[in-house]
Amino acid sequence: MTTLDSNNNTGGVITYIGSSGSSPNRTSPESLYSDSSNGSFQSLTQGCPTYFPPSPTGSLTQDPARSFGSIPPSLGDDGSPSSSSSSSSSSSSSFYNGSPPGGLQVALEDSNRVSPSKSTSNITKLNGMVLLCKVCGDVASGFHYGVHACEGCKGFFRRSIQQNIQYKRCLKNENCSIVRINRNRCQQCRFKKCLSVGMSRDAVRFGRIPKREKQRMLAEMQSAMNLANNQLSSQCPLETPPTQHPTPGPMGPSPPPAPAPSPLVGFSQFPQQLTPPRSPSPEPTVEDVISQVARAHREIFTYAHDKLGTSPGNFNANHASGNRPATTPHRWESQGCPPANDNIMAAQRHNEALNSLRQASSSYPPPWPPGAAHHSCHQPNSNGHRLCPTHVYPAPEGEAPVNSPRQGNSKNILLACPMNMYPHGRSGRTVQEIWEDFSMSFTPAVREVVEFAKHIPGFRDLSQHDQVTLLKAGTFEVLMVRFASLFNVKDQTVMFLSRTTYSLQELGAMGMGDLLNAMFDFSEKLNSLALTEEELGLFTAVVLVSADRSGMENSASVEQLQETLLRALRALVLKNRPSETSRFTKLLLKLPDLRTLNNMHSEKLLSFRVDAQ
């Protein structure tokens, strides 16, 4: 079984914990913007800071879509270039008419840019370029609390958290521009900027836990993930040529596996589900890419979510009796493939090893009671997408209504993730059982992403290592695009995979306010673009195939495939609405938002496990 290197923490779909070395892996630089070959850099202009990554070879690239983890935020929400940018690239981009948006400059190594008080040994460089502080734009001294930051902002954030400082209210409606020369003028806005760029509150508190205690918690979390990793084992693996075996990628043999299993739910079977790399096929035309991806998206993904939950007839019966809901069989499970006995035995051994964790978990207080369903639901939109079933089911029989007071104390067991069956554990459920429910509800969606990836033209030409890396890092972002229709921005409700809707206020009371607000905001922006089914399919492929993921064996091949998909997406968007020239740019601006959501989701799941201790 292929496992990821411990440094390959991309904030993936269910990357709940990083390596046991340090906690800030939860918001790693790779998952925020780029990997070791791609970085984020601010513009030298003093207006709105911009970010523009170098190419994997270290040379500058003029293409803002080449490494979409760092789409320049200097573009306005309407897609037009910011007026504060005073210069533009001298050569044109293949993704923009004429020249790329102005202000897309990279902070090159410049002795005049470095502040005199800082020695060159404290400057963080990447491919000969200077990394700038994400907060104020000064020269970054390293990766601090989840982002690249200077010494000043690192110390400011640490003091703010450790001393719990309440700063004086901003006099400019909390809209101060934080740059190096004025970063000390408004401390409230500076602290707000620290949080908005991804500095983690938990990175301070978690780091002060004694080493032995932290290792114990991480070991227990790892054990919980191992059981979930085997939920796919008893199901039929996707078709794999029986006479072929995984072969090394084109760049040489795969790196040795990490000593500990990868802490990912539903990903342990990726090497068995994916086919070995094949000989490169002729590059398809734009029309071929559009048609193949659109067909795969239409046939594999189900907007009615029929395959993600139970059927209406047995939904309430299962939960009333305390049984875990059964998922509807997928098309690849209907081929009559029997489960693998070896995988079943492995799952049984994991169950035996986790008896002690279950016993410890049984002493936790009862969880938040489930919420009653709202009587509103998404209706089919103008594109004809079926956003949800016409029936919304009430809370399971025999359990408390939604307006019941919170039971127990602050350690209630919560897993308020929209991609779960419920935002909480059912009555009497232990932490381990909640994890099992979560894995069972997530597994079908993950398998659909794997099947979709296999139908992307050129994806199976990549090495198997790179295929697995892309899937582990990007599956959550793909599912976020797919499940954007679960969020009803107008009614402020969200539908979980159990087909039950909850209001934003209810979920906020469960401790999920920040993540849900960010998901609502992303869903509103994405839905406002009114993507067609073909556009949504191609955008989903672009989200998955990202050359700036950490741990790639052959970044050049992934980048080439990414550019092919981007060209097809741009051609399709301009073909459908030729008058809306900024629509493609707006769509690309959603990519860094997905990276942020990916990290927030990983932190939420980690805090769930830590809070339950």
Swiss-Prot record:
Ranges annotated as biased composition (Low complexity): 69-102
Domain of life: Eukaryota
Tissue expression notes: Expressed in all tissues and cell lines examined. Expressed at high levels in some squamous carcinoma cell lines.
Signal peptide: none
Main subcellular location: nucleus
Start and end residues of each NR LBD domain: 285-613
Domain remarks in the Swiss-Prot or TrEMBL record: Composed of three domains: a modulating N-terminal domain, a DNA-binding domain and a C-terminal ligand-binding domain.
Full protein name: Nuclear receptor subfamily 1 group D member 1
Organism in which the protein naturally occurs: Bos taurus
Lineage: Eukaryota, Metazoa, Chordata, Craniata, Vertebrata
Gene that this sequence comes from: NR1D1
